A protein has these predicted regions:
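N-terminal beta1-alpha1 cap of cysteine-dependent amidohydrolase-like domains
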Residues: 1-97, 101-105, 226-255
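Hydrophobic/aromatic beta-strand patches that form the interior of the parallel beta-sheet core
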Residues: 19-21, 57-59, 77, 110, ...
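Flexible, glycine-rich phosphate/dinucleotide-binding loops
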Residues: 27, 65, 85, 118, ...
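Short glycine-/acidic-enriched loop or helix-start segments at secondary-structure transitions
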Residues: 30-31, 87-89, 120-122, 171, ...
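Glycine-rich, phosphate-binding/catalytic loops in enzymes
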Residues: 36-38, 92-96, 127-128, 178, ...
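Cysteine-nucleophile active-site neighborhood
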Residues: 73, 79-147
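Pocket-forming structural segment of enzyme catalytic cores
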Residues: 123-206
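C-terminal and late-domain segments of enzyme folds
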Residues: 183-255
Length: 255
């Protein structure tokens, strides 16, 4: 899977811009084949789009590279990461402050996995290790309450997942979008301010498969990784991820 390179933020000057906040990076062997998390997030937003997506700006917040203002871009995406939102590293605390500012300024925020967790934490929720342990591979989540701009979702959504932390306490004002027995707060909507998913709509099945194969028996428990791998079928984004991509473009456009 190839992805266009995402230029550094200072190189992008557009009337409408989407800032992607890079909070982690895949292993080089994976990135060389599938792109990095910024490219995956941009690929999700562009998937199935009838017109070209506005250019996006990369901010490597994991390296301390932050925008000078939460209004620097018209919308924000927070990527996944191998880090835990519970670490409270200085860059994470700075990111939490930026996300609060973005929400207050009316700049839409999209959180993906780690982004889901750090956004919830920033807005008054709680993130903890999940009592259910690692969740790996394609997971099904029951849709509870979808806003109008998420029209098209079925009663369940299937997304790739890889996490062992979860949002244990939902922030004030957040609405539950999707849930599962193993992940009660799987997706949240914050009015028109933000939306987040514990799963990875931006991960292709090919990337998830390679990720599980690389880390199974090492970082990831061999039994769960093996079960997830055995159940993986097909390639590309899941059908529900494509529906979500269309909805996220509406979410940004209607800000």
């Amino acid at each position: 899977v190839s992805h266009p390179g995402i230029p550094p933020a200072k190189a992008v000057v557009v009337a409408m811009s989407i800032g992607i906040l890079e909070t982690g990076r895949p292993a080089p062997a994976l990135a060389s084949r599938h792109g990095d998390y910024v490219e995956m997030a941009a690929g999700l937003l562009a998937a199935g789009a009838p017109t070209p997506l506005p250019e996006v700006a990369r901010f490597a917040v994991i390296d301390g590279e932050f925008p000078d203002s939460a209004t620097r871009c018209d919308a924000w995406v927070v990527t996944g990461s191998r880090h835990s939102a519970t670490e409270e590293a200085p860059w994470m605390l700075r990111l939490e402050a930026l996300l609060r500012e973005a929400v207050a300024a009316g700049r839409p925020v999209i959180g993906l996995c780690f982004g889901h967790q750090i956004l919830a934490k920033a807005l008054g929720g709680r993130v903890e290790p999940s009592p259910f342990g690692w969740q790996l591979g394609l997971q099904d989540y029951r849709v509870v309450d979808a806003p109008d701009w998420l029209a098209g979702l079925g009663p369940t959504i299937g997304l790739n997942a890889i996490h062992q932390d979860h949002v244990s306490v939902v922030p004030p004002g957040a609405r539950l979008l999707a849930t599962a027995p193993h992940c009660p707060n799987a997706a949240l909507v914050y009015g028109k301010a933000a939306i987040s998913f514990q799963g990875h709509p931006e991960f292709t099945r090919d990337f998830e498969r390679d990720l599980l194969a690389l880390y199974g028996g090492d970082t990831l428990p061999a039994d769960r990784a093996g079960q997830a791998l055995a159940a993986m079928e097909g390639g590309g984004l899941t059908a529900d991820a494509l529906t979500i991509a269309d909805a996220l473009r509406r979410f940004i456009a209607e800000k």
